[in-house]
Amino acid sequence: MATSKKGLISPGIFIPIFEKNGFITELDMFVFTQVCKNFKRWENENFPTFPISINLSRVHLENPDFISELERITKEYEIEPNLIEIELTESAIFDNTKILFKIMQTLKSVGFKISMDDFGSGYSSLNMLKDMPIDVLKLDRQFFITVGNAKKSQIVVSSIVQMAKQLDIKVVSEGVETVEQAEFLRLIGCDMAQGFLFARPMPIEEYEKLILDRYSVKGKEIN
């Protein structure tokens, strides 16, 4: 979120406020719609597209009918659901396991990918991973604050990555800020990494320029 005076505002600041006043559901649907609009525009412009992750608030768990609205929006803009990854936070998952598992299965049946965000930030249960219908596990940045020099942290992260692979779950490491962290994650077979080392949050115009620049460097032409 951005304002003209303060610039980018962290989701950690405005999301709790919106969850309290009930505006979060409207915000989530607005974001989802904008993503679908952009996918359609990129498709029309022959612009490279990649799956996009969208965070959904735990508030939606109180109204499972929201899935039909997500499906309606994707059909309106003729977007394949598998281009969208629905992110649910660790805290939401472990607070409402029975309800959420059913919702996750329904989302997957529609075609959406499911990811568990901020894994490791709370009281995660490794045993529960075998039952969760998720496609992607996003490791919380707390794992990597000391990963460059803490042997125990490296062992924990490596074990989680290997276990996820055995469960056919992709792993994304959040909060990567150093080359050493990225190299460690590459060596243990982590699927993807994100963090300030690669890019900071940016407006869509900057994102599009970044993609165009990188593709032009590779010698690919985009109409």
Residue ranges and their predicted role:
Residues I103:
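Conserved functional hotspot residues or short segments at active or partner-binding sites
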Residues K20-N21, A150:
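Residue-level signal for well-ordered alpha-helical positions
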Residues F14:
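Conserved, function-defining core regions and hallmark residues within catalytic/recognition domains
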Residues M1-S4, I17, F23-I99, G175:
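Catalytic core of bacterial c-di-GMP phosphodiesterases, primarily the EAL and HD-GYP domains
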